[in-house]
Amino acid sequence: MNREEFLRLAAEGYNRIPLARETLADFDTPLSIYLKLADQPNSYLLESVQGGEKWGRYSIIGLPCRTVMRVHGHHVSVTHDGVEIESLDVEDPLDFVETFKARYNVPTIAGLPRFNGGLVGYFGYDCVRYVEKRLANCPNPDPLGVPDILLMVSDAVVVFDNLAGKMHAIVLVDPAQQDAYARGVAQLDELMHKLRQPITPRRGLDLDRAPRADPVFRSSFTQGDYEAAVDTIKQYILAGDVMQVVPSQRMSIDFKAAPIDLYRALRCFNPTPYMYFFNFGDFHVVGSSPEVLVRVEDNLITVRPIAGTRPRGATEEADLALEEDLLSDHKEIAEHLMLIDLGRNDVGRVSEIGTVKLTEKMVIERYSNVMHIVSNVTGQLKNGLTAMDALRAILPAGTLSGAPKIRAMEIIDELEPVKRGVYGGAVGYMAWNGNMDTAIAIRTAVIKNGELHVQAGGGIVADSVPVLEWEETLNKRRAMVGSAWWPWPRRLPRVEQACCSGNER
C-alpha cells in the first residue's frame, strides 16, 4: 500500500489501517519466527494440524501487544504499555468486549490472510455466568486466580503461509498519529531486519536421555472422590434430572522448565487442529486442543462435537480394531448422538431457519495418544447477529458441560471442588473483519508461579463405569503430561493425593 492509498482509507474513516510486507519463509518456521520477534509478555503463537497429520495453511505469530483487557468477574481493566487506562464494573462483560472491539474500524485489504489482527486470548468457562442467571455465582474456590477473560489487541502479526512458503508481516497503523504512514513503514522495516537475524540457540530436547524419578501430581480429586462424583451424577440421571454431565479433575505439578519448551514438545508429540502458546506475563497458557468451540467465517457458523475416546494402538491393525470397538460401543454412541443434538440446538439459536446442517457424522479422528468420534455441524448466522452472539449461544460446549446444559453445569458446580477458569472455555481470536475462530480449552496447561495445571474430564451417562471414567481422564491428560516431562520419564507421573477433594468441601 502506498501513501496515497493509506491517506484515502484514512479519509474514509478507518482508524486502523493495515500495512503489510510479504517475504519468503524458506529459512524459518513459525516457532523460530516467534522466538525472533515475539518472545515477550503479551505475545502468542497459533498453529494448526489438520486431521492429526498435516500442518494447516496458516500459523499466526502475535508480536507483544500494547493494549490488554483483563476481566475478573464483572470488573474490567484495560492497560496500555502496562498502565491502566480503563477500570470499571460492568453488568455484562461480553457486551463490553463487543463494544470495545467496535472501537477499531479496519478495512478489508485484498490479498492479506483472513486473519490480520483482532482480539486474541481466551474466554474462560465461567463466562457462561454472564449469560445464564441461574449460574451467576460460582460457589467454588479459585486457587489459580487468572482472569475470566483475557484479550490482547493484536495489531502487529506475522502470518506464516505453510502452503505458499511465504509470510506476511502486518502492522495496524493509527492514521491519526503524526507521520503515521512513515512510522508504519519503519516498523515493517524493523520487523524484516529482525527476521533476517539468526535465532538465539535454545537447549535441545534429547529423546534419548535417561528417565528421571517418577514425578507426582496433586489432583483436585482422589480417585475415590471422583468415582463417587460419577455415582452421584448417575443418580441424577436415573432420577430424570439430567441426561449427561461432564465432570473434570485438575492435576497440578511443580514445573520449572521454560513454558515455550513445553509447547515445542507438544507440537512434536501431540499436533492437533488448535496449537497455542500464550505468554501473558504473570502466567502462560499452552495447549493442543483437538476441538473447535465455534468458528464464524463469512457468517458461516461451525461447531465440531468430539465425544467417544479410545487410546491409540501400537500398530495400524490395533488402531482399526480400537476404531471398530469405539463405533460399536453403545454408551459412546449414545453420548455422541446426544452432543450432536445439543450442537444443532446451540447453532440453531443463532442461525437462519433451515440452514443448520450435519455435514459429517461420527467419523474417527486419530491423535497422538487417543482417537475420537467427531461430527460437524454448520449454520448460517442470522442477519443482524455477530460472532459474539454465536459465542454466547455455544459457550461452554456440550462436550464440556452435558445435557440439558444448564442443569448439567449446576451439577458441575455442586461436585467439582475448584473453579474451572480457562479449562472448558474458548481460546482463539475475534478478527476485525467479524470472523472468529476459537478452540475448546482442553488438553491445555496453565503455568503460573512455578506450577503446571492441567484439567481433564469425561461425559457421564446412565451406564458409565466410575473406574473407567477415572481412567479416561488420565488418558486425556497423557499428551500434556508426557510433553511436560519429555524426554525424561518412560511412564506417566502418578496422581498421589487430592489438594482439594470433594469430601473436604
Swiss-Prot record:
L-tryptophan binds at residues 48, 273-275. Its EC number is 4.1.3.27. Feedback inhibited by tryptophan. Keywords: Amino-acid biosynthesis, Aromatic amino acid biosynthesis, Lyase, Magnesium, Metal-binding, Tryptophan biosynthesis. The keyword Lyase applies. Signal peptide: none annotated. Pathway: Amino-acid biosynthesis; L-tryptophan biosynthesis; L-tryptophan from chorismate: step 1/5. It comes from the Bacteria. Mg(2+) binds at residues 335, 472. One of its GO terms (molecular function) is metal ion binding. Coiled coil: none annotated. Binds 1 Mg(2+) ion per subunit. Chorismate binds at residues 308-309, 423, 443, 457-459. Its cofactor is Mg(2+). One of its GO terms (biological process) is L-tryptophan biosynthetic process. SUPFAM superfamilies: ADC synthase. Part of a heterotetrameric complex that catalyzes the two-step biosynthesis of anthranilate, an intermediate in the biosynthesis of L-tryptophan. In the first step, the glutamine-binding beta subunit (TrpG) of anthranilate synthase (AS) provides the glutamine amidotransferase activity which generates ammonia as a substrate that, along with chorismate, is used in the second step, catalyzed by the large alpha subunit of AS (TrpE) to produce anthranilate. In the absence of TrpG, TrpE can synthesize anthranilate directly from chorismate and high concentrations of ammonia. Belongs to the anthranilate synthase component I family. This is Anthranilate synthase component 1. It comes from Pseudomonas savastanoi (Pseudomonas syringae pv. savastanoi).
